[in-house]
């Protein structure tokens, strides 16, 4: 199927944010289906597990016996922590898959094409391992930079910001995609940072609105019954993930293509070649899909 495609021309910061919003709105149904199919079951697991464990009131436990053995006090929390760890890992993997699948949808839109959510999920699944590796490396690198000094962390995060788009669209390994992002953003640091800041401010606003509604419902539920008062909060968090994750992918995709237009004169011919590679139809000069997730290459490669 074909639809109107975004313009392949240099964009201002405001135009990038506006373009991301328009991309998100144009492909809203497909993007939400992707996020709901992946993240919905994870949220359901979280709800069922938390409901099965039940609420744990630490303050009441300590008041009943202030001199109790700490291990006895914290023992009821162990199942809760295990559930939180499992759902956190699943949420991370799910969010990464949603990002990759969303980028696939949005990249095709630049050629005026619309693909279904099933096809995009297959593309995201094929690129999941290198996406996970890249996300972990970027988080570690940026996190270390933020710990020692705020500026290096922000710098690294910005320079690596289009790694997911490069990884999915050009079928690169994690390390090569990070290097590709660095090359593309070099010389455009401030505009890219500005676009990212504006997009994350929008993300925060939407999250706060949904979270505020969920918190209000939680308070009302707690007054009625403590047993399931946690449900609105968990559901609210899931809705935030489903709604917001594709928008972040939209912003990353817009920035990525803007950089390629500016630096490489990116056009429809090059895009067609990229999309063929993304779908695995063009095997020239490419390693087998899923190989070399770190992007290091074989010992004898040049």
Residue ranges and their predicted role:
Residues 14-41, 115-144, 156-209:
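Interfacial aromatic "cap" segments that immediately flank transmembrane helices
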Residues 11-14, 92, 96, 155, ...:
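Soluble non-cytosolic domains of exported or imported proteins
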Residues 1-74, 81-85, 89, 93, ...:
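Generic N-terminal leader segments that precede the first folded domain
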Residues 57-80, 116-136:
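Long, highly hydrophobic alpha-helical transmembrane signal-anchor segments
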Residues 24, 28, 32, 73, ...:
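Hydrophobic, aromatic-rich alpha-helical transmembrane segments
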Residues 34-55, 80-96, 132-157, 195-222, ...:
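Hydrophobic alpha-helical transmembrane segments in multi-pass membrane proteins
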Residues 2, 7, 56-68, 104, ...:
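Juxtamembrane transition segments at transmembrane-helix termini in multipass membrane proteins
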Residues 97-126:
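Hydrophobic transmembrane alpha-helix segments characteristic of membrane transport
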